[in-house]
Structures are given as structure tokens and as C-alpha cells.
A protein has these predicted regions:
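TPR-adjacent "capping" and linker segments in tetratricopeptide-repeat scaffold/adaptor proteins
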Residues: 2-19
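Structural register within alpha-helical repeat arrays
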Residues: 16, 23, 56-57
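Start-of-helix register in tetratricopeptide repeats
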Residues: 18, 52, 86-88
Length: 100
């Protein structure tokens, strides 16, 4: 059904989100950082995989000096998961501010 949804312009399914995540992981392993970041971002925007895509996205941004992408990611994380333990995201936010 995910294929039909994407074919006819419907909303992506949870299957699509997992497929995007797997593709991002493969691109990361190959060293295609831009492609990996784009697909992690798709998964984050999709929302069905919860916290799962945030960590690799943030790690890649930090490792490859893509600091300008992190403020939006942090904002989305805080909005979606306001009750989560945010100690780690606080540290990332502080480091991002220092880098920018």
C-alpha cells in the first residue's frame, strides 16, 4: 500500500518511513552524508519512527560540521517529545549554539 500511496501522492506510511530510514543508514555507511541527512530528515518529518532517526541525524550533523541544520531538528524534537528526558538534547543545543 505504501507504494500505491507514494504513486498516487498519498501520505507516506510507517513502512515508507522505515524504508527511508534503512536507505539513510546505507547511505551513511557508504559515506554519502548529504543523501543520508536528507533521508533522515524525511523520516523525522514523517514522524512514525519516533525518536529513532534523531540520534543518527544529530550525530552526522555534528561529525560533518552541518551545525546549521541542528536548531530546527532540536525544535522538532522538543515539540514532539516534550516529556522525554531532554538532558542529552540540552547538551546538543548548547554545543550547537557554541558552534554557530
Amino acid at each position: 500500500m505504501g507504494f500505491l500511496n507514494s504513486l498516487f501522492g498519498g501520505a507516506p506510511t510507517k513502512y515508507d518511513a522505515q524504508k527511508y530510514f534503512d536507505y539513510a543508514e546505507k547511505q551513511k555507511a557508504k559515506g554519502n552524508i548529504v543523501e543520508a541527512l536528507n533521508y533522515y530528515a524525511k523520516v523525522i518529518n514523517h514522524g512514525d519512527l519516533g525518536v529513532k532517526p534523531f540520534v543518527p541525524y544529530i550525530e552526522l550533523c555534528m561529525e560533518h560540521d552541518e551545525w546549521e541544520k541542528l536548531p530546527a531538528c532540536i525544535k522538532v524534537y522538543r515539540k514532539r517529545f516534550p516529556k522525554e528526558n531532554s538532558g542529552w538534547i540540552d547538551k546538543i543545543e548548547k554545543e550547537t549554539i557554541e558552534q554557530l
